[in-house]
A protein has these predicted regions:
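Aromatic-rich, lipid-facing transmembrane alpha helices and their immediate juxtamembrane interface loops
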Residues: 1-204
């Protein structure tokens, strides 16, 4: 593994993650839904996890149990940190597992952590080797140029998306304030309903 092959792992897994997320969301919503965090076909949380797994678990490739456990742990931490960061930056949740069993803050849950553990183990055991063999097919100079161009496009895409979100938030400060007011109103309504029900029970 070197800088260029890690970039390939980052880009490929970001793209595959986007494909998987978009297909599932499109099927559920019955219309095309771009699940990327930017306008391009990337879900960078998958690429980040892929690189960390490739670097951190390379020595465990022959130990399936340790490989699964490491993938489970690393992917879960990456998912939680990413979800928390995105909510802080964009003021909304990109995914919410609150309705699933064994979830933590709605950011991660056991069901998907097990899935990430399995997929991570498969990627480290076989997927990365396949990518390295494909990279070796291209002439070094052409390969390096392609990596730099692809990484530049991905970086610009992510930066432009962040700029658009910040500008939109700056032009519409009332949206966040309105969301907070609605949340407070909902809490007050719930309290009134609970008090009303309690009074009726006492009268009965």
């Amino acid at each position: 593994l070197n800088f260029y092959t890690l970039c390939v792992i980052y880009l490929v897994y970001s793209f595959l993650g986007w494909v998987g997320e978009t297909v599932v969301a499109t099927i559920k919503g019955r219309q095309f839904t771009n699940r990327g965090m930017a306008s391009g076909p990337f879900c960078f949380v998958y690429g980040t996890a892929g690189v960390l797994l490739a670097v951190g678990l390379a020595d465990l490739r022959t130990n399936w149990l340790a490989l699964f456990a490491g993938s489970f742990l690393i992917a879960t931490v990456v998912e939680w940190v990413t979800a928390k960061f995105l909510e802080r930056v964009h003021h909304r949740r990109w995914w919410d597992y609150s309705g699933k069993k064994f979830n933590l803050d709605g950011y991660v849950c056991l069901q998907y952590s097990v899935l990430w553990g399995v997929l991570g183990a498969v990627s480290v055991r076989w997927g990365n080797d396949l990518l390295l063999r494909l990279c070796a097919v291209f002439p070094p100079l052409l390969f390096h140029i392609a990596v730099w161009v692809s990484m530049s496009i991905a970086a610009l895409d992510q930066i432009s998306a962040a700029v658009v979100v910040e500008r939109y938030a700056a032009k519409h400060p009332r949206l966040e304030q309105l969301g907070q007011e609605l949340g407070k109103g909902k809490s007050r309504l719930q309290q009134k309903i609970a008090a009303s029900v309690e009074r009726r029970i006492q009268k009965a």
